[in-house]
Amino acid sequence: MKTAKELIFDRFIAPLQTSRANYIGIEIEMPIVNLNGEKTDKTVSIAAMKKAIEHFGFTPQKFDDDGVCHEAVCPDTCDIFSFDCSYNNFEIALGRVRTLHEAQARFRDYVSFINAELYQNQHTLTGLGVNPNYLINDFNFVPSPRYRMLAGYLKKAEVWRSISPAGSDFHPYYGFGTFSSASQVQLDVNEENVCQAIEAFSLVEPLKAVLFANSTLPELPELLCVRDYFWERSAHGINPRNVGFFKPFPKSIGEITDYLSKASIFCAERDGKYLFFYPIPFDEYLNRDRIEGEYYDGAYHPFRFSPEAEDVAYLRTYKQIDLTARGTLEFRSACTQPLHQAMTVAAFHLGLMNRIEALTELLSRSFLYREGGDPDLLRRKMNRVDFLSAVEPEALKVLLLNVLTLCAEGLRERGYAEELYLEPLFERAKTLTSPSLRLLRHGGDLDSVIREYAAL
């Protein structure tokens, strides 16, 4: 069997050596909200997706244990409709696009149609990072093998609390995937720029918290964005290499390979069974004779198996920035945005990818980092309601505007007039107001915010 590092290289590094045409990958998850303030009716969600599949000519691809389609793909564009974790959370994953205008046009068409269907039953997709009715919603995951595995794994934190070094920090929201939504972007990278891109975009993470925070919980009134909390204080965070930031920033391909070889694997598949187990660093996993796992078949049952080299396909992390097996960096930390501003997240990353060196230089000499600031600690501060107590507001405003100006230059250089998608971010920077802050300052009329953030 190949070593862990050799397997990591083949899966994650080799794709960086292939020349590609700099496409954009965009995935937007959206909560399905019952406008009557009641729990989401999954029959309404399922019916709306069925109509959308028929209307847009998608092909049903995955079905749950009850025969309900929970994922469908467009044969022409490779766009995907799916329910992410639960029937309360709808995801549109756009196939590779060359311009943001192309992405925006398809996204608008899909959301307009689906919301027209949902509105007939007083439901809507909206642009919030947490479903506002999460406390009364059904927390059940989609009843399919993969999601039953994930549900079992996250719930197992109750048992692992006593044996994990991170156990005392576990949160009680084991079903957070059923009510949290993100806007994720994938951009092509190569061997030459991947390390620099990881560093530059890690440095900008605290500023992203200021611009994109859009997930609040009444039980955690101090936080503007609960995404980091959900992932880092769940079973996914047992190994710090699987969440958060690269520490330290990798300076070479060898350092990336070494880092990922010590990230943990927590699932595999045998005999058609999706298995989960206590997360094990991948290099240790390959050296084990037997692994004690569990699978679902009416209930969770034990299953012993031996590691195989092919299991590297199940190794994945949930970091702020992930290196994927497609030769891309996936940016995962942004909450879903108000739907009329859905392309802001992609525009931000796309523009800065064209200005990596200038971004690194700007941030390194900024007040955030010139005295050795830690982007992880800074992001935690910026995620808080009282973040302005940790910085000088005018200095923060100037830095945000300078970063956005760099971003606009990067987009302008592409020649597609995509910089227009940054306009809401310039306004947020000038006022130091994220969608979360806007919601909190709205005065409690949640229904009007739900409708406003659902508008295109």
Each language-model region and where it sits:
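C-terminal accessory/tail domains of diverse enzymes
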Residues: 1-91, 95-97, 176-177, 192-199, ...
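Short, low-order "capping/linker" segments at domain edges
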Residues: 138-152, 227-238
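Short, conserved phosphate-binding/catalytic loop or strand-edge motifs used
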Residues: 177-183
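The substrate-binding groove and active-site-proximal loops of carbohydrate-active enzymes
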Residues: 93-104, 186-188
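Glycine-rich, histidine-containing beta strand-loop boundary motifs that form or position
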Residues: 30, 94, 122, 127-131, ...
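Contiguous, non-catalytic segments that form substrate-binding/exosite surfaces or channel walls
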Residues: 99, 104-144, 231
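Structured alpha-helical segments in the cores of large, soluble enzyme domains
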Residues: 76-80, 110-114, 118, 160-175, ...
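Acidic, His- and aromatic-enriched active-site or binding-groove loops in soluble protein domains
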Residues: 143-170
